[in-house]
Every structure is written in structure tokens, then in C-alpha cells.
């Protein structure tokens, strides 16, 4: 019930998804292993901000999951160097790629985060 919400109520919901992918990367440091084809399990999370509607939700998380499924299919078990529109497979470019794919479908999209837990790397994109 939105009558229980403080005014103005601003919330941020999130949904995670995972994908496994391979890539190469041209780097100045730790270059040898990066130049070879290698893979990671990526953990991504998207955030949607807004005020709850009459249904008490910022957005139905089922709609978020549906949009994520389409993006995940473009990345999961793919060679990222060949994904159109991605560019070099950096965490920064992955965040931007996911943002651009989701932004038209998810009004209120406020951030995209991509992590590689195995090596402790993370990037957050907040325009």
C-alpha cells in the first residue's frame, strides 16, 4: 500500500545475473595471460530506481528478469571479442553494453555493475 510509503519515497531495486564468456585483452601489465584466449564467470547486477506505483513496486522484477534474459543470451558462452557493439571486453565496456541494451526497456535504470569474483575486479556504471 503506497499510503504507508514516506513522501517522496525513492527506492532502488536490483537483479543479478551471471554469464560465462571468453575473451582476449591487450594490456600493459599482466599482459601475457590476457593476450591468450581465457574465460571468466561474470556476475552482473542492474539497479532500477523510482517511486513505487499503486501496486507497491518500483517495477515488477519479472520484467527486469525478462530483459536480462535477452542480454544474457548475447553474452553467455560467447567469445566476447566477437560480440557486435561491445568493443574490447573490459568491465567498463561490459557495463556500458548492458546499460545500452537495457535502458530502453527499463525506465529508471540507475546503475549496472559487473564483477569477476575470482580475481576481485568490479566496475559500476552510473550515468
Listing of model-derived features with the role each one plays in the protein:
Residues 3-127:
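Charge-rich, low-complexity N-terminal segments
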Amino acid at each position: 500500500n503506497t499510503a504507508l510509503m514516506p513522501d517522496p519515497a525513492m527506492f532502488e531495486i536490483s537483479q543479478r545475473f551471471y554469464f560465462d564468456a571468453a575473451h582476449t585483452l591487450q594490456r600493459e601489465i599482466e599482459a601475457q595471460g590476457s593476450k591468450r584466449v581465457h574465460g571468466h564467470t561474470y556476475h552482473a547486477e542492474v539497479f532500477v530506481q523510482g517511486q513505487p506505483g499503486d501496486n507497491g513496486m518500483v517495477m515488477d522484477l519479472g520484467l527486469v528478469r525478462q530483459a536480462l534474459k535477452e542480454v544474457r543470451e548475447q553474452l553467455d558462452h560467447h567469445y566476447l571479442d566477437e560480440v557486435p557493439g561491445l568493443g574490447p571486453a573490459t568491465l567498463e565496456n561490459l557495463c556500458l553494453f548492458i546499460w545500452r541494451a537495457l535502458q530502453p526497456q527499463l525506465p529508471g535504470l540507475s546503475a549496472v555493475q559487473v564483477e569477476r569474483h575470482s580475481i576481485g575486479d568490479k566496475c559500476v556504471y552510473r550515468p
